[in-house]
Regions:
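Conserved class I S-adenosyl-L-methionine
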Residues: 15-38, 51
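Conserved SAM-binding loop
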Residues: 22-25, 56-146, 218
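Short "lid" loop at the C-terminus of a central beta-strand within the Rossmann-like core
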Residues: 28-30, 140-145, 173-178
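Glycine-rich phosphate-binding loop and adjoining beta1-alpha1-beta2 segment
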Residues: 34-66
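Conserved Class I S-adenosyl-L-methionine
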Residues: 148-174, 183-190
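A conserved mid-domain beta-alpha-beta active-site/ligand-binding segment of alpha/beta enzyme cores
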Residues: 175-227
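Short, charged low-complexity linker/loop segments at the C-terminal edge of domains
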Residues: 221-245
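Membrane-proximal basic amphipathic "stem/tether" segments
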Residues: 239-299
């Protein structure tokens, strides 16, 4: 659990209200100092709410969130190692009434993947938030084998929150570099586009990244009972995969077009090679040109 300079900049530019009470899922390790925070805030046009002076480390998390504008900073963890405000197992129903409907922001900086019952944890987050409160998840998407129990697809969080009366405000994909180096280097951040990600998957296209993180922001807009979404994700994938094969097929099938127009007589005699070129030229084009996700920038 930790907040790098990249992740901090994404927090500061998040579409949330920076006031009131925040609860961290695990006491966050702040991987920069207050001087660097001031520099990063200026870069993303964020107004620091209070002067602060802190060094790197877990002890800085309260001062960090104070500087963002929160006057009450709490944390919850399963053990006392990092001195959390509350000791609770988020994989079970939380029992402390001080946690219910008490927070304007719940921040998950890499805890959800370590909880064996993530659906239970998400329900606890829902209960902890005040009406109109926000959740921010910064969790692994890809290439973090054995970092925790899970890596999350955006569809998982998106589906849960949409069906439980939350407004999903932002989903970003963060191309994180090698461990420990991401504190010193800027990384590419992309806006999540479900249809484009399905197309990339069907074409074997990946984002160039050692690790892939997700930055997810949603707002609680109504109170309701827990809903566990039921969806045939495989059927949805197959449908979108077929759509991706048809979108711009003639445009991307450049080898076929080239041969037909340049060597029409040879093309008519090519037999089975015509089918091979028609089948794979579009895929080759996609592999060369890569993805079409919107790049938010380097952070």
């Amino acid at each position: 659990m930790g907040i790098s300079r990249t992740l901090s900049k994404l927090i500061m530019r998040s579409p949330i209200d920076f006031h009131g009470a925040v609860c961290q899922l695990g006491n966050q390790n702040i991987r920069f100092n207050s001087k660097q925070l001031m520099q990063d805030a200026e870069e993303v046009y964020f107004s620091i709410k209070s002067k602060t002076n802190f060094k790197r480390g877990v002890v800085a998390s309260e001062l960090y969130f104070n500087a963002l504008g929160f006057n009450q900073v709490e944390s919850i963890d399963i053990s006392s190692n990092d001195k959390p405000s509350f000791i609770e197992d988020l994989g079970e129903d939380i029992s402390n009434t001080k946690l219910i409907n008490n927070f304007d922001l719940v921040f998950d900086g890499g805890t959800l993947e370590h909880i064996f019952n993530p659906d239970k944890a998400l329900n606890n987050i829902k209960k902890m938030l005040k009406l109109n409160g926000h959740i921010i998840h910064q969790v692994p998407c890809n290439n973090q084998l054995e970092h925790g129990f899970f890596q999350f697809s955006p569809s998982y969080l998106n589906k849960f929150y949409e069906e439980n009366n939350f407004l999903v405000k932002e989903i970003l994909l963060i191309c994180v570099g090698p461990p420990k180096l991401d504190d010193f280097m800027r990384v590419n951040v992309y806006v999540y586009d479900k249809e484009e990600v399905f197309r990339m998957h069907s074409k074997g296209i990946n984002l160039p990244s050692t690790f892939l993180l997700m930055h997810f922001v949603a707002q609680k807009i109504a109170e309701d009972k827990l809903v566990i979404p039921k969806v045939d994700i495989q059927a949805e994938f197959s449908k979108m995969e077929n759509q991706s094969k048809n979108i711009g097929y003639e445009k991307t099938n450049f080898l076929k077009s080239f041969f037909k127009s340049t060597f029409p007589n040879i093309w008519r005699k090519m037999g089975i090679l015509k089918a091979v070129i028609s089948r794979y030229s579009s895929t080759l084009y996609d592999r060369v040109t890569g993805h079409n996700l919107k790049k938010l920038g380097k952070f």
